[in-house]
Structure formats: C-alpha cells, structure tokens
C-alpha cells in the first residue's frame, strides 16, 4: 500500500484527505505531524518544507506541489533524487482563465471607469473598441498561459504570447527570444504575466521592461510577487508610462495594510486568488501520478530542476 504525507499551513486537510482516499482507496494518507512510521512514506503532497522535514523521510520518492508553481521548492527543500511534480489541475486552469478573461474584459469595456463615475452620478459613455483591435500579450505559454491565450483569442482579441521556447497555438502569435519580447511589449495594450518564477524571471517586471511597453498600457501580474519590482511599477504609473496594473501576487503576503498599492488609484489588488487548487480535481491528478509511479511509468508534469519548471 503506497503511503502519502499531506502538509499545508492553509489548505484544508480534511477535504484533501477525503478526496485522495476517494480517488485511491488503497492509499494510506497521513497528515503532518501524525506521520506514523516515516520509513513508510513514499509520497508527499505539500505547499512548502519550512523546516526541511522532507529530508527525514528515507523512502520518499515523489513530492507533489499543491500549487502550479514550484519556486518555493526549488532550493534544498526537496532531497536530491526525489521527483518534484507541479500541480496541473483542470479547476486551477479554469480559475486562471476566468480571472484573466475577467480582468481583460474589465479593462477592455472600461468597467472601472463606469464604477468610478457612478460614485459621482456621472453619465459618460466611453468609446467601444472591437476585441480584434485590442492587443493582448502573455508572458509565459505554459499550461496556464496557453489556456488563457486560447480563451482570449476565442473571444476575438488579438493575442500574442512570449515564452523561452517556440510554441504553436492556433489563433495566437507565439514568439520567443529578446526580439520577440520587445515586439510583444511594444504592441500590446494589455500585458499579462504568467511566467514561472526562476532566477531568470525574478524581477523581470521592472523599469526597463516598463519602458518597452506601449504607453498607457495595462499590466496584469497573476504569477508571483517576486516577478515584480514594486518601486519600479510605482514610478512607471506615476510617470504615465503604464495606465493601470492588476496585481494578484506580492513580495510580502498578506500585503501590509500600509502598502502603497492598496490606495493607489491605478492599481487593482486581489489577495492571491487568481486561481486556487481544487481538492477533488487536484487529488485526482495526484492519484494519477502515484498510479503511474507505482506502474513504473513516467509521472506527468515532472519538474526539470535545471530550468526551474
């Protein structure tokens, strides 16, 4: 009987253990700190390893991340020789599609302007632009980025995407390299960051990048707070280089009450809720991974530690 250890400071243990047992009745699920005999534990489903406890599990084979990102597990937290698997959950993808499409449509149709006008009883109609005339650029064309790109293209937007390697996505202009990035930034009315957090992408949303963006454009960061140089964003907004920013992730979370972002008229703050892992569909993905490993087959969505995703 395979044994899995669940540990998370915020995800509901009962919901996850119930779902895991439903998708694999033969799985022995344990919840930290009730580990039982640690030499039995082959699998771990966690958000982080703050105290290095994974190194105390001698039979550990695979660590499943509770989130789509694995940047928090890329140091020495996961022992050498142990597979690291990122979460690819249909509900997680659906949630990101909803968030990104909503924020793009909100900017596209001037909804924030109309809400402000209502507070002052101001009847003013803004011009409407057809979706095909609104250029949207995505940074990152992984599982989430590609899904969002396809959805936005299906809504009629002029969509381009940039990634480290070349991609082919119907209805989307996919580019790579520094020239491709320059082209995407300069032509996009809305730029969406869905990049994985690696040493190469840490701080990528900075003053130099903002200078290359179309004047007055909108930035949506639904990836990691560490992608963004916060002071550079405030400068870019103050100078009018950017028109608005929608931020779902931050350097420090929860965002401190006194932080400038909360009350900035050109920043929309959401509390890292763009997409949340669903226990039922997430547990199904984990069960599939365990079944594959037990059968001696490759586990889907394994992380390349050299690339960081």
Report residues per predicted region:
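Phosphate-coordination loops involved in phosphoryl transfer and adenosine-cofactor binding
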Residues: 1, 81, 132-135, 216
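C-terminal helix-to-coil terminal segments
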Residues: 83-87, 91-96, 113-114, 253-309
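Rossmann-like adenosine-cofactor binding region
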Residues: 165-260
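N-terminal glycine-/charge-rich "phosphate-binding" loop or analogous flexible N-terminal tail
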Residues: 1-43
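Short acidic low-complexity segments
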Residues: 29-40, 51-54, 171-187
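Phosphate/diphosphate ligand-binding glycine-rich loop within oxidoreductases
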Residues: 42-115
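Gly/Ala-rich phosphate-binding loop of Rossmann-like dinucleotide-binding domains
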Residues: 149, 153, 237-238
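Glycine-rich NAD(P)-binding loop of Rossmann-like domains
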Residues: 114-147, 174
């Amino acid at each position: 009987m395979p044994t899995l250890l669940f540990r998370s400071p915020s995800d509901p243990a009962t919901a996850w253990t119930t779902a895991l047992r439903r998708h694999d009745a033969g799985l022995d699920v344990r919840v930290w700190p009730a580990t039982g005999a640690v030499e039995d534990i082959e699998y771990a489903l966690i958000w982080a390893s703050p105290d290095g406890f994974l190194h105390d599990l001698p039979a550990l084979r695979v660590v499943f991340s509770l989130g789509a990102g694995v940047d928090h597990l890329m140091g020495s937290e996961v022992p050498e020789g142990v597979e690291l698997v990122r979460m690819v959950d249909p509900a997680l993808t659906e949630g990101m599609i909803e968030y990104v499409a909503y924020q793009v449509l909100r900017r596209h149709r001037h909804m924030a302007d109309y809400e402000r006008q209502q507070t002052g009883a101001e009847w003013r109609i803004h011009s409407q632009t057809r979706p095909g005339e609104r250029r949207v650029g995505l940074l990152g064309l992984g599982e989430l980025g590609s899904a969002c790109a396809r959805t936005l293209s299906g809504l009629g937007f002029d969509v381009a995407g940039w990634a480290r390697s070349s991609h082919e996505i119907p209805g989307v202009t996919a580019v790579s390299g520094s020239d491709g990035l320059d082209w995407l930034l300069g032509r996009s009315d809305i730029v969406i960051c869905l990049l994985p957090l690696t040493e190469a992408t840490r701080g990528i949303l900075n003053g130099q990048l903002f200078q290359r963006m179309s004047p007055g454009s909108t930035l949506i960061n639904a990836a990691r707070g560490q992608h963004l140089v916060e002071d550079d964003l405030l400068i870019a907004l103050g100078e009018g280089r950017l028109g608005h920013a929608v931020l779902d992730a931050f350097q420090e979370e929860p965002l401190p009450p006194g932080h400038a972002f909360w009350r900035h008229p050109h920043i929309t703050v959401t509390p890292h809720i763009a997409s949340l892992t669903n226990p039922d569909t997430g547990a199904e993905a984990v069960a599939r991974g365990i079944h594959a490993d037990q059968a001696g087959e490759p586990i889907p969505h394994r992380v390349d530690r050299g690339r960081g995703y």
